[in-house]
Amino acid sequence: MESQSRRRRPLRRPETLVQGEAAESDSDLSASSSEEEELYLGPSGPTRGRPTGLRVAGEAAETDSDPEPEPKAAPRDLPPLVVQRETAGEAWAEEEAPAPAPARSLLQLRLAESQARLDHDVAAAVSGVYRRAGRDVAALAGRLAAAQAAGLAAAHSVRLARGDLCALAERLDIVASCRLLPDIRGVPGTEPEQDPGPRA
């Protein structure tokens, strides 16, 4: 009998406790298949003045101690934001009057006057130089034009004189080569008369 009772008793496996979630066994599937395990945090046994916390599977709720996300800086390539605020009773067609110019000191007035005089003197000197140069160039151009006209007139006169000389040379050649004219060199009576001497 004792041997039969020993045979009927199943052998128990040594149990090992591992920190963390317990593995599901065949015997626990029927009892805890739809339930979630809850573990007590803190020391074993009841604590005085401190409630024990529970760890529940799922997403943890946000608390005040959670770090807040830091604000991201805007990219530098974006233009700055300009906010225009309208004041009550502002007229759209109203234009701002220009700010009055600051009063000038005596030194600034003197400097402005001297600068104006200097500018006037420089402009007058430059304009005078240009006027004199223009007059000189005009006079030189007139002289060159007169010299050119005189040269043209002299060339025309020389051309006319050359034409006259050519015509005279042709006539002399005609007279010298013509044999129809009498020889006036040997004709008697053509000699010049001699003047008689003074009468006594």
Swiss-Prot record:
It comes from the Eukaryota. The keyword Cytoplasm applies. Residues 41-55 have a biased composition (Low complexity). Its main location: cytoplasm. Residues 1-11 have a biased composition (Basic residues). It is found in: Cytoplasm. Keywords: Cytoplasm, Phosphoprotein. Belongs to the BLOC1S3 family. Phosphorylated. GO terms for molecular function: protein transmembrane transporter activity. This is Biogenesis of lysosome-related organelles complex 1 subunit 3. The modification Phosphoserine is found at S65. Component of the BLOC-1 complex, a complex that is required for normal biogenesis of lysosome-related organelles (LRO), such as platelet dense granules and melanosomes. In concert with the AP-3 complex, the BLOC-1 complex is required to target membrane protein cargos into vesicles assembled at cell bodies for delivery into neurites and nerve terminals. The BLOC-1 complex, in association with SNARE proteins, is also proposed to be involved in neurite extension. Plays a role in intracellular vesicle trafficking. GO terms for cellular component: axon cytoplasm; BLOC-1 complex; cytosol; transport vesicle. InterPro entries: BLOC-1_complex_su-3. Residues 1-81 are annotated as: Disordered. One of its GO terms (biological process) is platelet dense granule organization. The modification Phosphothreonine is found at T63. Component of the biogenesis of lysosome-related organelles complex 1 (BLOC-1) composed of BLOC1S1, BLOC1S2, BLOC1S3, BLOC1S4, BLOC1S5, BLOC1S6, DTNBP1/BLOC1S7 and SNAPIN/BLOC1S8. Octamer composed of one copy each BLOC1S1, BLOC1S2, BLOC1S3, BLOC1S4, BLOC1S5, BLOC1S6, DTNBP1/BLOC1S7 and SNAPIN/BLOC1S8. The BLOC-1 complex associates with the AP-3 protein complex and membrane protein cargos. Interacts directly with BLOC1S2. Interacts with BLOC1S4, BLOC1S5 and BLOC1S6.
